[in-house]
């Protein structure tokens, strides 16, 4: 087992990993930017080192500085968390070249799954259903139009190296295709340095369902059930839950088996997530595989009792999985709300500032992952997510009621948050009944914001 792990991240995920390391008897090394000098992950780590100024490109994305700290402090592994360098194949390879273990899949697998058109082709070979679309990259507007005519509008133009909703455009008719394609291509180049594009049939009003995977070095692969991530705004998830009301046990087993097939096809090792869209007609299709721990991993932990970060570390240390598929049972229901420092009434304007007052609720089946404390400075330099509120109940209605109670108790003063919007969603009748898909926020946002 590892003796010392560097956490190449910040915020609540860095705190989550540090706590896990301490529980496993492993020393934790934090890195931080000058803007994060007083952050909680810095205070909780056994050692902490400044790696640069506030700008992410000069700190949390600075591979040279991170690897230097890891080497000089005697670390034998690096955990990348999510975001930043977590899906950077170059970084994964450099960690290994420096004689340390990257807690995640290999650089080759990250490359394969990071290129969405390559991943799509591999899923076809594995027998995993994919959305009808282009076979490989689109080389020109005319080629794209020809493919779109073949599969039928509407279509979704996507960056092969994309993620987080960037480098992506919907197109409903041919006369709009050229503009949508060129806009998505330019955005992909700006965001990812790669303007390789592909295209899929746009599935209207789907559910976004993802399956959590664990795979070890000995060929053992299991899934830990699904998470329903359909409540999202502009392709950014807001709420997640498990299990999904939309899945029968038969469909759950079928999708879970396909998720395992996907992981086995690429020789996946460590924790990963296989994402699907579930169409209104009950058919489902592979979207992508995320080669890292997910923001919403606590939802799965609450219903399975499996510590996913602990399993990540064990797998990276070449230990066998602690669980067989038959050991995995989804007990009760879990729900997560992401709390962001933003103002929904002002177009979700970011709201940096000092947290002047804070009350963190508790109770049975309540978990709050955050780095907030009274006096904490929410920075304008980083992602707006400042907390994750997770609850567990015996069933979906119980967890919804519990989340309403927790959000009504949560106090974060000094900055604006989306807390009240989340609270209102939990009272919306379609949401409570489970009648929602990825278009829910788009359809209900105006009435929810005006209800405040």
Regions found by a protein language model. Give the residues of each.
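Short, basic, helix/turn surface patches
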Residues: 53-65, 109-111, 129-137, 156-165, ...
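Acidic/histidine-enriched active-site and ligand-binding environments that engage anionic O-linkages
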Residues: 147-156
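ATP-binding N-terminal substructure of ATP-dependent carboxylate-amine bond-forming enzymes
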Residues: 1-125, 138-146
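ATP-dependent carboxylate activation and anion-phosphoryl transfer catalytic cores
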Residues: 7-23, 48, 71-73, 96, ...
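Structural detector of well-ordered beta-strand residues that form the stable sheet scaffold
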Residues: 29, 79, 101-103, 131, ...
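A cross-family glycoside hydrolase active-site/sugar-binding cleft signature
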Residues: 31, 81, 133, 200, ...
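Alpha-helix capping and helix-loop boundary segments enriched in small/acidic/polar residues
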Residues: 36, 54-57, 86, 107-114, ...
């Amino acid at each position: 087992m590892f003796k010392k792990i560097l956490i190449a991240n910040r915020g609540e995920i860095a705190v989550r990993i540090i706590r896990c390391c301490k529980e496993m008897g492993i020393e934790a090394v934090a890195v931080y930017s000058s803007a994060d000098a007083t952050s909680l992950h810095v205070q909780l780590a056994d050692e902490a080192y400044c790696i640069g100024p506030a700008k992410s490109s000069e700190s949390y994305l600075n591979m040279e500085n991170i690897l230097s700290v890891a080497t000089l402090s005697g670390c034998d592994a690096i955990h990348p968390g999510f975001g930043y360098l977590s899906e950077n194949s170059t970084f994964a390879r450099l960690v290994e070249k420096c004689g340390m273990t990257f807690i995640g899949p290999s650089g080759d697998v990250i490359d394969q799954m990071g290129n969405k058109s390559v991943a799509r082709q591999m899923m076809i070979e594995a027998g995993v259903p994919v959305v009808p679309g282009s076979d490989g990259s689109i080389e020109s507007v005319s080629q794209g139009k020809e493919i779109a005519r073949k599969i039928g509008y509407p279509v979704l133009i996507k960056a092969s190296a994309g993620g987080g909703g960037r480098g992506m455009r919907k197109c409903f008719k041919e006369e709009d295709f050229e503009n949508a394609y060129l806009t998505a291509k330019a955005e992909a180049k700006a965001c990812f340095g790669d303007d390789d594009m592909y295209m899929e049939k746009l599935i209207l009003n789907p559910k976004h369902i993802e399956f959590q995977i664990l795979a070890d070095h000995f060929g053992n692969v299991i899934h830990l059930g699904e998470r329903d991530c359909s409540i999202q705004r502009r392709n950014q998830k807001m709420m997640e839950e498990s299990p999904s009301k939309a899945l029968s046990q038969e469909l759950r087993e079928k999708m879970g088996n396909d998720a395992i097939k996907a992981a086995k096809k690429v020789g996946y090792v460590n924790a990963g997530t296989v994402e699907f869209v579930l169409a209104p007609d009950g058919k489902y299709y592979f979207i992508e595989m995320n080669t890292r721990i997910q923001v919403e991993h606590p939802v799965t932990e609450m219903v399975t009792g499996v510590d996913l970060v602990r399993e990540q570390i064990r797998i990276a240390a070449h230990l066998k999985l602690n669980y067989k598929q038959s050991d995995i049972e989804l007990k009760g229901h879990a729900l997560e709300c992401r709390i962001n420092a933003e103002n929904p009434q002002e177009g979700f304007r970011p709201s940096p500032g000092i947290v002047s007052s804070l009350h963190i609720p508790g109770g049975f089946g309540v978990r709050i992952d955050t780095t907030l404390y009274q006096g904490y400075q929410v920075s304008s330099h980083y992602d707006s997510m400042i907390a994750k509120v997770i609850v567990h109940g015996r069933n979906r209605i119980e967890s919804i009621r519990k989340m309403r109670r927790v959000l009504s108790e949560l106090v974060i003063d000094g900055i604006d948050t989306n807390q009240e919007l989340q609270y209102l969603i939990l009272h919306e009748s379609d949401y409570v009944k489970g009648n929602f898909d990825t278009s829910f926020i788009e359809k209900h946002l105006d009435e929810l914001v005006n209800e405040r």
